[in-house]
């Protein structure tokens, strides 16, 4: 007997009205979409990743990440790294984000480093990530999650490695620049073995680059503006002339930018580079309470240094004795912070237009500022939004309706994020893998 095959009729259960409503989202003018998203808190922005591909692309774009303020244009975006006990192995790092309304604790992590006395830490912050260089060990940290990746060791036998960190928004690439020096006793000798590591590149190794300018880094910090990393160095005969070096992330070119003005050459204070309204600036301190801000102007192809701002902090109640200018906010305020703290920790914002100060206290649940003279590092203009590294995976949601978001890259641990649109909440889930994976 011949059997007939049973045909199963399938029906399209998609709701045409729902599809039409979703299409209406894409009809909203792009500028209006940006304006709406910029006024929303982070969790709401993450929720709108699921509206459409156009909205997801917009949210992950570098321009939106740069302009996003977390729902408030007046909210400070300072990032503070504290509890840096360099004299102990495997120091614990705490990341804080001070806020006018509710100061927040972001994360903590234990650095996988020991502490030989001849090595130093180098911290650099750019576009929401932090690089920490410690001798030949280099890691890159996401302070929002407390996760980090370990980079391969540079190609060198030397122990003293100085590193800098940069980001190019055009190519959406992070790069680490490092160079080596002899351990001690050779202050007049230039650095050598200049190498570059590109995060996310297929070739996970350091690339040697040429530098025709003999120089030796003088300041531990750097500033990255428009895909160029700037740092202060010594050059010339005997390494006595102080200059500004620049590293172009697009071309991997390292060269001399300009010589520092004489007023800064003779300063006895440490140099600290900041980004002031898109320009390289150096806050100089003639004395404990006075600050001169020198800004580098490159208009017309000619480089000149202008002393744009001078302000003084009068000793007053509630101010610690010695503050450093560590950066500026997106609203143009200068961030002043101590290098250490005791029972409490504060940062200060100075508004040059209003000639006014405001004091922001840093608090963290479960973390006490109870030990005297703990070291700290304060980064300005921290970008908390790193949604470009999260993507909806698999069937996009769980059986309970939660959306699954996973990172593009991982190191030792693999975690996925579950977002519940009903409760507007996130939870992190560690994925256990029992075989090798790439």
From Swiss-Prot:
InterPro entries: F-box-assoc_dom_typ3, F-box-assoc_interact_dom, F-box-like_dom_sf, F-box_dom, Gal_Oxase/kelch_b-propeller. Residues 22-68 form the F-box domain. GO terms for biological process: defense response by callose deposition. Residues 1-24 are annotated as: Disordered. This is Putative F-box protein At5g15660. It comes from Arabidopsis thaliana.
């Amino acid at each position: 007997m011949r059997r007939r095959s049973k045909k199963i009729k399938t029906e399209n259960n998609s709701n045409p009205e729902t599809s039409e409503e979703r299409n209406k989202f894409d009809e909203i003018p792009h500028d209006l979409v940006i304006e709406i998203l910029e006024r929303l808190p982070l969790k709401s922005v993450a929720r709108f990743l699921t509206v459409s591909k156009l909205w997801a692309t917009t949210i992950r774009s570098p321009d939106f990440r740069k302009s996003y303020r977390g729902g408030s244009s007046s909210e400070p975006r300072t990032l503070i790294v504290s509890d840096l006990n360099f004299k102990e192995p495997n120091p614990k790092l705490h990341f804080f984000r001070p806020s006018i309304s509710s100061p927040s604790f972001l994360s903590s992590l234990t650095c996988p480093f020991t502490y030989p006395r001849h090595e130093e830490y180098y911290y650099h912050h750019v576009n929401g990530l932090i690089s920490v260089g410690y001798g030949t060990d280099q890691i890159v940290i996401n302070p929002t999650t407390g996760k980090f990746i370990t980079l391969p060791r540079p190609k060198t036998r030397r122990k003293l490695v100085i590193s800098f960190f940069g980001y190019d928004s055009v190519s959406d690439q992070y790069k680490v620049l490092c160079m080596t020096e002899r351990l001690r006793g050779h202050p007049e000798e230039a650095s050598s073995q200049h190498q570059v590591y590109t995060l996310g590149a297929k070739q996970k190794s350091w690339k040697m680059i040429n530098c025709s300018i003999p120089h030796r880094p003088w300041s531990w910090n750097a500033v990255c503006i428009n895909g160029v990393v700037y740092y202060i160095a010594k050059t010339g005969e005997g390494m006595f002339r102080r200059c500004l070096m620049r590293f172009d992330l697009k071309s991997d070119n390292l060269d001399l930018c300009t010589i520092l003005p004489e007023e800064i050459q003779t300063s006895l204070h440490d140099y600290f580079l900041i980004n002031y309204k898109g320009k390289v600036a150096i806050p100089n301190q003639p004395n404990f309470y006075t600050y001169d801000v020198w800004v580098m102007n490159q208009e017309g192809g000619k480089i000149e240094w202008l002393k744009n701002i001078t302000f003084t902090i009068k000793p007053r109640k509630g101010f610690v004795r010695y503050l450093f200018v560590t950066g500026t906010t997106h609203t143009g305020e200068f961030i002043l912070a101590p290098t250490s703290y005791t029972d409490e920790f504060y940062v200060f914002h100075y508004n040059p237009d209003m000639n006014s100060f405001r004091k922001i206290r840093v608090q963290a649940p479960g973390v006490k500022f109870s030990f005297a003279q703990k070291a700290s590092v304060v980064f300005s203009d921290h970008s908390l939004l790193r949604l470009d590294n999260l993507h909806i995976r698999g069937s996009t949601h769980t059986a309970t309706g939660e959306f699954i978001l996973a990172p593009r890259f991982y190191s030792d641990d693999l975690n996925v994020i579950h977002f519940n649109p009903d409760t507007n909440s996130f939870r992190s889930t560690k994925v256990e893998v029992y075989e090798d994976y790439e």
